[in-house]
A protein has these predicted regions:
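Sec-dependent N-terminal signal peptides
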Residues: 1-21
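Sec-dependent signal peptide cleavage junction
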Residues: 20-45
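Non-catalytic accessory regions used for complex assembly or targeting
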Residues: 37-66
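Short pre-active-site segment immediately N-terminal to the catalytic Zn-binding motif
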Residues: 71-86
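Active-site recognition of the HExxH zinc-binding catalytic motif
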Residues: 85-101
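Post-HEXXH active-site segment of zinc metalloproteases
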Residues: 98-145
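Extracellular-facing segments of soluble proteins and assemblies that are Gly/Ser/Thr-biased and enriched
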Residues: 142-185
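Pan-zinc metallopeptidase signature
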Residues: 174-285
Length: 285
């Protein structure tokens, strides 16, 4: 009888302490659930950028076989008495003027509009922000005020009520540089010493314009089409600069690039470019 009791007690103790898990496996069921491999999250697709454009048809019989001809053919009163790059730049301004005038005459807008010719055959139209052009200056650090600064800022009071005047110039410099690159490819002489300075210098001034818009007219900045137009224009400017930088080397363009990437007083410009313009220019070696 005593032996039977002893066997029963031994059996109960065996089942009380028996663990069928691997003796080396100390992980609880709950912990195993936590360390289970999770599926990789699906990447969020990039937002498709979009801004409304209009067609800009040819208005004369100028030969459109090259970039120069594409621009000149869309201008009712083109400039033709200077070097081709300068003619393209100035004729871009004239195209902008005819686009604005057409908007006013057709009563598409209530105030003086901004209108920008996008090479080779499109345009983007938008009204002006609600502040004076001089407000942009404080967003341009001293290290990034180069040769064209005094021409378009400082004592220059023309177009004072139109901040997008800076973008007007930016687009004109881009188009002039497009012609310089195309002419080089086609064996056409290019007389300018600095065809690539305009795109990078005015990229800086245009970023400053966007910074001013964001601070001084946030409702305007929240117009996604304007942001997308500026993104597209900045991207084009960087592409042109990279393509022509070594073809047309010039000291100022390298100083602008270096200061943009490294100067302490340009930190706000860099931060804005990283946030809104995919760090264009900042990753160029």
């Amino acid at each position: 009888m005593n032996i039977m009791k002893i066997l029963i007690i031994i059996g109960l103790l065996f089942f009380a302490f028996y663990n069928p898990q691997d003796p080396e496996d100390k992980t609880s069921v709950e912990e195993k659930k936590e360390v289970a491999v999770q599926p990789e999250p699906k990447p969020v697709p990039a937002r498709k950028r979009f801004f409304t454009t209009r067609n800009v048809p040819a208005v004369n019989n100028f030969d459109t076989k090259d970039a120069y001809g594409q621009i000149i053919s869309r201008c009712r009163t083109p400039q033709l008495d200077n070097q081709r790059m300068t003619n393209a730049h100035e004729s871009t301004h004239f195209i902008h003027s005819q686009l604005r005038n057409d908007d006013v005459l057709s009563r598409r807008v209530k105030t003086f509009p901004g209108a920008f010719y996008i090479f080779p055959d499109k345009s983007f139209h938008i009204e002006q922000p609600k502040f004076l052009r001089k407000e942009i200056e404080r967003y341009i650090p001293a290290s990034l005020r180069f040769s064209r600064f005094n021409t378009y800022f400082g004592r220059n009071k023309s177009w004072a009520e139109y901040p997008l005047y800076i973008i007007d110039e930016f687009v004109a410099y881009i188009n002039g540089s497009i012609v310089a690159l195309d002419d080089h490819k086609n064996g056409q002489r290019v007389d300018s010493l600095d065809p690539m300075v305009g795109p990078i210098e005015f990229a800086v001034y245009s970023v400053a314009t966007c910074m001013a818009i964001k601070d001084l007219d946030p409702e305007y900045w929240n117009n996604q089409e304007f942001q997308d137009f500026m993104y597209d224009t900045m991207k084009k400017s960087e592409s042109i600069f990279k393509a022509g930088r070594n073809i047309y080397p010039y000291k100022n363009q390298e100083e602008i690039l270096t200061n943009l990437k490294t100067s302490p007083d340009a930190e706000n410009i860099r931060a804005f470019m990283k946030e809104h313009f995919d760090s264009f220019f900042l990753s160029i070696d």
